[in-house]
Amino acid sequence: MERKSYSIDITRIAQYAMYAYCIFALFSLAFSVCGQAGLSFRTSPILIPISPILVIIKQLVLQLAPIALWGIFRYTLPAGVKLLRRCSELMGLYYVLSFILGQCFNLHLVTMMQNGQITQMASILTWTESTMGLISVIASLVAGCHLCSKHRGNMRKLGIALILVFIAWLLCSNILPVAVFYLAGNTQQAAFTCMYIISMITTTSAYIYAYYMMYRAIKTIGCIGQ
């Protein structure tokens, strides 16, 4: 790998981004599971004033941390691994687009409903985000397969983690919902609740492991580049 010198400690930034993502991903998981179980953080008098603030911070961290990690990973990659660089750029572009669209919807800059129907602009933006999401998942799989076949150590472990993210997405977003819909019968509501909790735990675990290994890979590349 070619040598790189950094004016700032981007490895430390990646570490902070990874820790922030892990903490707030676990918080989001607990929040969602408690919601499905009929519990609420708002029942606590101590958490009532800070819950809305925590939710806003959680949303921002979970949107911005992946941008930072993928951006740093892309920046640290040597020029010779063009496939990984392109995949990283696609992933970063997807997360940037998701963040921008999320802010547009949250701040009501885009009208979602009009006369009881979804507006054309909202449909176009939602379709664009869904398409980019599918492309990013494929890019993640391609990057994972490349890392597993061409690299060793932490880079190979990152490849395995990215493949696990794809498997989690395939199972939790596509296979499990269809299976529950056709097999659950009269217990669909309870089955969907269990499926949602399992999907949340699986997906969160996969992403936490992937971003942890991405930080390790960035650290490895940074050590080589010094």
Spans of features found by a protein language model:
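Membrane-proximal helix-loop-helix units in multi-pass membrane proteins
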Residues: 97-154
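Transmembrane alpha-helical segments of multi-pass membrane proteins
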Residues: 12-22, 82-99, 157-171
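C-terminal transmembrane-bundle signature of multipass membrane proteins
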Residues: 27, 146, 167-226
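Alpha-helical transmembrane segments of polytopic membrane proteins
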Residues: 50-63, 123-137, 173, 192-206
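Interfacial non-cytosolic loop connecting adjacent transmembrane helices
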Residues: 36-51, 106-127, 176-200
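Cytosolic juxtamembrane helix at the C-terminal end of the final transmembrane segment
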Residues: 2-13, 69-84, 141-159, 208-226
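Selected alpha-helical membrane-embedding segments in polytopic membrane proteins
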Residues: 47, 51-78, 85, 94-99
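Alpha-helical transmembrane segments of multi-pass membrane proteins
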Residues: 21-39
